[in-house]
Amino acid sequence: MANGKTAIVFPGQGSQRHGMGKDFYESTPGCRRIYEQASDALGWDVAALCFGEDEKLNLTAYAQPSIVVTEIAMLKAIIDQYGITPDVFGGHSLGEYTALVAAGVLPLETVLRIVHIRGSLMQEAVPVGEGGMAAVIRKDIDTRTIRELLADLPIDVANINSPNQIVISGRSKAMPEAERRLAKALADRKSTRLNSSHS
């Protein structure tokens, strides 16, 4: 990348999975320190949650800080192991908080407390398992059409990620009907359920 700039963009919630970051944790001492620092700030063992099979990882109050920690640890590993020096950081949704830490705008401990509270509030708003999200992808997707198709369902457009992707969110029981309607009206669309306990 001669004369170019290096940008790192962090994803949002829904990117979590059991075992995330374990390889970096085991191979990079700096990553272990980040997980330890996060555990001290949050009062629970972040590494154990990320590397084990605990379903709490899919609860937004735990998923959000765990994702931020893993993203910062991965950044540390990339910098340490490959000597990459990012010029710019960005993020999508929850990833914006990680970008603030990476850019040195806010300390990790502060962001972890913020996203834990953010996730807890989301979790309190809707009982576990009653909310769902799906990404809908289609060239030049029309948000108004989506809203009209789903108007009588407890589902709405939650995010407009790009001209070609939106996220719908609402009651999980209504999600299959929403997907059926979208498939019938917009045959060329793709949709993917997102791994988020709350929407």
How would you name each of these model-derived features?
Residues 49-58, 83, 95, 139-142, ...:
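Generic structural signal for short, solvent-exposed loop/turn connectors between secondary structure elements
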Residues 65-135:
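Gly/Ser-rich oxyanion-binding loop with an adjacent helix/lid
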Residues 2-90, 168:
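Helix-rich "cap/lid" substructures immediately adjacent to catalytic or cofactor-binding pockets
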Residues 39, 78-79, 100, 150, ...:
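Hydrophobic alpha-helix position signal
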Residues 16-18, 23, 47, 95, ...:
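Short, electropositive, low-hydrophobicity segments enriched in small/polar residues
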Residues 194-199:
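Positively charged, low-complexity/disordered segments
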Residues 13-15, 103-193:
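Alpha/beta catalytic cores of group-transfer enzymes, especially the acyltransferase/condensing modules
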